[in-house]
Amino acid sequence: MNENLFAPFITPTVLGISVLPLIMIFPCLLFSTSNRWVPNRLIALQLWLVRLITKQMMMMHNKQGRMWTLMLITLIIFIASTNLLGLLPYTFTPTTQLSMNMGMAIPLWMGTVLMGFRNKPKASLAHFLPQGTPTPLIPMLIIIETISLFIQPLALAVRLTANITAGHLLIHLIGSATLALSSISLTVSTITFTILFLLTILEFAVALIQAYVFTLLVSLYLHDNT
């Protein structure tokens, strides 16, 4: 029986009902809460990370753009949590689904664009035509800039999906090779297991970096329209 490499990326169901919403809610349980006046070390670390990310992302925004702070911080925590969740055994990574990533990218991108056309219509329209463009090239550049604008949410979603899926496939392939070689050559299987271990550590970094990149690009789109 041939093994399907993409089986881990199929949305899990129970009795024909998708359990994806339950999986997406689970990361919330990973963040501890406390009723004490003085937080413990884990909560203090979480607060420090949130403040650091907030400072890095929102320092370039004006007062209007900083109204999105809570949404962007929630977004990066959610994406990072779901990415890391998929690295646990017998789990599912929601961000490997292009439909879910498009569902996040399109509303956020559309919100920034609509805000720009509402608050700065002239500046938003000026993005379609760079200053100093020769007259014969004006129609072509307007078409190109329009296409590039509408490609932004697709690029956001595809980038996140491709990077997370590629890493999981590599882990799956190297893990299968390690298991197959364990009965043939212990030395070679040890080498492949070491590669698998290092790749898993790298995937933890990729999961966090992709969450940061996704949110940072949304923040840049917001900055261009505020």
From Swiss-Prot:
It is a multi-pass membrane protein. Subunit a, of the mitochondrial membrane ATP synthase complex (F(1)F(0) ATP synthase or Complex V) that produces ATP from ADP in the presence of a proton gradient across the membrane which is generated by electron transport complexes of the respiratory chain. ATP synthase complex consist of a soluble F(1) head domain - the catalytic core - and a membrane F(1) domain - the membrane proton channel. These two domains are linked by a central stalk rotating inside the F(1) region and a stationary peripheral stalk. It catalyses: H(+)(in) = H(+)(out). This is ATP synthase F(0) complex subunit a. Disulfide bonds: none annotated. GO terms for cellular component: mitochondrial inner membrane; proton-transporting ATP synthase complex. It is found in: Mitochondrion inner membrane. Keywords: ATP synthesis, CF(0), Hydrogen ion transport, Ion transport, Membrane, Mitochondrion, Mitochondrion inner membrane, Transmembrane, Transmembrane helix, Transport. It comes from Ornithorhynchus anatinus. GO terms for biological process: proton motive force-driven ATP synthesis; proton motive force-driven mitochondrial ATP synthesis; proton transmembrane transport. SUPFAM superfamilies: F1F0 ATP synthase subunit A (SSF81336). It comes from the Eukaryota. Belongs to the ATPase A chain family. The keyword tRNA-binding does not apply. Its main location: mitochondrion. Signal peptide: none annotated. One of its GO terms (molecular function) is proton-transporting ATP synthase activity, rotational mechanism.
